[in-house]
């Protein structure tokens, strides 16, 4: 299986048909140490990411062959997406369907579990981040009276609280590689998803 040359994602299709190749041919890996991440991770979370059909923001620079290799090594695959997309169908693993547009609530609930159970790198946060205490106050409900628990997010996302807790605990205890897709509302984001739109 190779990346879809007739992808609905504008850049990839255009590059393949205009230049005869995509930027992936002969390009370096701009997303850091992809090889190192894949060699050392125990779990990959594909969050709104379908690199088998469209590269999007995260650009799928590790490629189909590397994803297959990670699967053969026994790396657990988790897919968070409203749809059982091509990548999740191809690689298998756990699919967590989330209602469209509700990912922030899911992220807040995962963060709640990490903070509540101490499943984050406290030294890294203390040395390399700013604003953590204010954000923590919001997540824990100290700011607005609504703790962002897995139970809190369930009516909005449709993801059962026990699934969120299990994911957060596993993610917090394993070396996890986040393969996030799309670009949100930034460059190309609106058109680089199956349900996106062209704005120009």
PLM features per residue range, with description:
Residues 1, 167, 171-200:
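A glycine-rich, hydrophobic/aromatic-adjacent loop/helix-cap motif
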Residues 71-78, 83-174:
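Long, well-ordered, tryptophan-enriched scaffold segments
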Residues 16, 55-59, 88-93, 107-111, ...:
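Short acidic, glycine/serine/threonine-rich loops at helix termini
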Residues 1-40:
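Anionic-ligand anchoring segments at beta-strand to alpha-helix junctions in alpha/beta enzyme folds, i.e.
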Residues 10-11, 52-55, 85-88, 104, ...:
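Flexible loop/turn segments at secondary-structure boundaries
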Residues 50-64:
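Glycine/threonine-rich flexible loop motifs
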Residues 61-74:
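Catalytic-core regions built around general acid/base machinery
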């Amino acid at each position: 299986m190779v990346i879809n040359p007739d992808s609905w994602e504008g850049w990839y299709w255009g590059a393949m048909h205009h230049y005869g190749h995509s930027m992936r041919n002969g390009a370096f890996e701009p997303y850091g140490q992809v090889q190192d991440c894949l060699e050392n991770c125990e779990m990959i979370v594909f969050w709104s990411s379908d690199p088998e059909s469209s590269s999007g923001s995260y650009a799928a620079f590790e490629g189909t062959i590397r994803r297959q290799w990670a699967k053969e090594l026994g790396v657990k695959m988790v897919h968070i997406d409203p749809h059982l997309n091509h990548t999740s169908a191809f690689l298998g693993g756990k699919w967590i369907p989330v209602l469209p547009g509700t990912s922030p609530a899911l992220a807040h609930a995962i963060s709640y579990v990490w903070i509540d159970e101490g499943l984050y790198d406290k030294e890294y946060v203390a040395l390399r981040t700013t604003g953590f205490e204010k954000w923590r106050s919001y997540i824990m409900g100290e700011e607005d009276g609504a703790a962002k628990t897995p139970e809190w997010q369930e009516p909005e996302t449709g993801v059962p609280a026990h699934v969120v807790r299990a994911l957060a605990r596993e993610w917090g205890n394993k070396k996890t590689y986040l393969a996030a897709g799309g670009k949100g509302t930034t460059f190309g984001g609106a058109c680089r998803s199956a349900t996106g739109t062209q704005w120009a």
